Amino acid sequence: MSLFTLFTLAIGLAMDTFAVSVCKGLAMKKMSLKKAFINGAYFGLFQAGMPIIGYFLGISFRNYITKIDHWISFVLLVFLGIKMLKEAFDNEACSTNDSVAFRVMIVLAVATSIDALAVGITFAFLKVNLLLAVSLIGIITFLLSMLGVRLGHVFGARYKRVAECVGGIVLIVLGFKILLEHLGILAQLF
């Protein structure tokens, strides 16, 4: 997987955490760089860690499904993208507080990184530099989560829906790209 594709994937995965971070920032009465940093650290670490777990899960059964591995990658990415698009249009308002306590953040970090676990499974079937992939995912998630807190505090929740839509579309496009390359319809562009 090329650097551009990994970068695009990392941005797509980070959109869920960005949206939650916007809500966190919205809930803050006073902007706190420390809270934004803690928020970004939780999300970045979990988004980077889950693909590693997914990768090793995928490796464990890769030999059994090598003939359909690209179809699995396609289905997982498209499913996650559609799920993210659906969530973008649910009329759920930001329902979080500004707490960065362990119990609050661990639940949010796990909930927003399940898609990263699924993407990690797809990494087992693709030519991916795992260290580079998880580093990009973690760093980009960390930075976008911190930015989300700031934007949420300054502008409110108006970017939440856009972020989730962008993330969903990116995951769907990557799913189709993987499938079309495997079928020989699309030469590796990126």
From Swiss-Prot:
Pfam family, one: Mntp
Transcription as UniProt keyword: no
Lipid bilayer topology: Multi-pass membrane protein
GO MF terms, alphabetically ordered: manganese ion transmembrane transporter activity
Segments traversing the membrane: 3-23, 41-61, 65-85, 106-126, 128-148, 166-186
Keyword RNA-binding: no
Source taxon at top rank: Bacteria
Residues spanning the signal sequence: none
GO CC entries: plasma membrane
Cited InterPro entries: Mntp/YtaF, Put_MntP
Protein keywords: Cell membrane, Ion transport, Manganese, Membrane, Transmembrane, Transmembrane helix, Transport
Sequence similarity: Belongs to the MntP (TC 9.B.29) family.
Job description of the protein: Probably functions as a manganese efflux pump.
Name of this chain's protein: Putative manganese efflux pump MntP
